[in-house]
């Protein structure tokens, strides 16, 4: 029987990371609703959109894996492209159909992004506890490869915080694609999503072994992306309700006649 590799886990760090990552959706939602008048329903739809997208992706990946085999090089392109394709298509469908009545308000894009990124952070925060309870199994499966120090958990928590901003940014991209009937922003969202995930793939496959370098790159990239999407958001205009606008115009004309 092979001896399980000894790996150190900083339990206080894991618990703090769990608390921080799990609370992000509540913190962002509170700020969005309290200070910017965002809608809770949109945040919930964003979370459900993420869950449905990942669920469908998992089913398709499972079928492909059965066809080609777990370790086949043929499934790599699917692992690299499906996350962006499914999640951004989920965003597109939600904005186009489910949230059609709320698309007049550009804040819908932010609220949806909070739900999407927040629920992902919540689920990852919960899964962080597995490092404590099933440590040996994760080591044997190759999921836990190195010491889980306090600094490591801190950077992981920070990366989750930054990832929420990435999801908000991508939501702005897809929202703009719907609002302006410009498909290139939807395609760009898919490409950006898969580009970010590609670096996680490099670490998982031991192509890049320095996790700190990957995390720092993602943080740096997220700052640039957030700045660009903020400019897109600012330039979006809230559409007025057509009925209200018609009534207002009619009222103004009526006053002029009098």
What role is predicted for each listed range?
Residues 1-258:
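Hydrophobic alpha-helical segments at protein termini of multi-pass membrane proteins
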């Amino acid at each position: 029987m092979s001896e399980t590799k000894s790996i150190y886990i900083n339990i206080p760090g894991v618990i703090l990371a769990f608390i921080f990552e799990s609370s992000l959706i509540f913190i962002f939602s509170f700020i969005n609703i309290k200070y910017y008048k965002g809608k809770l329903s949109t945040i919930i739809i964003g979370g459900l959109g993420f869950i449905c997208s990942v669920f469908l992706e998992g089913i398709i990946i499972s079928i492909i894996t059965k066809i080609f085999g777990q370790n086949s090089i043929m499934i790599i392109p699917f692992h690299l492209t499906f996350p962006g394709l499914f999640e951004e298509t989920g965003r597109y469908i939600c904005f186009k159909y489910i949230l059609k009545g709320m698309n007049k308000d550009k804040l819908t894009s932010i609220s949806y992004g909070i739900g999407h990124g927040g629920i992902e952070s919540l689920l990852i925060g919960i899964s962080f506890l597995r490092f404590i309870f099933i440590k040996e199994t994760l080591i044997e499966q190759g999921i836990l490869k190195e010491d889980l120090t306090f600094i490591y958990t801190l950077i992981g928590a920070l990366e989750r915080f930054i990832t929420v901003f990435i999801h908000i940014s991508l939501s702005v991209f897809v929202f703009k694609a719907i609002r302006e009937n410009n498909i290139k922003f939807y395609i760009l969202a898919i490409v950006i999503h898969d580009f970010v995930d590609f670096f996680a793939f490099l670490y998982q496959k031991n192509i890049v072994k320095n996790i700190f370098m990957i995390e720092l790159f993602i943080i740096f990239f997220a700052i640039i992306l957030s700045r660009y999407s903020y400019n897109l958001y600012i330039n979006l205009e809230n559409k007025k309700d057509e009925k209200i606008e018609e009534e207002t115009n009619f009222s103004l004309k009526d006053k002029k006649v009098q």
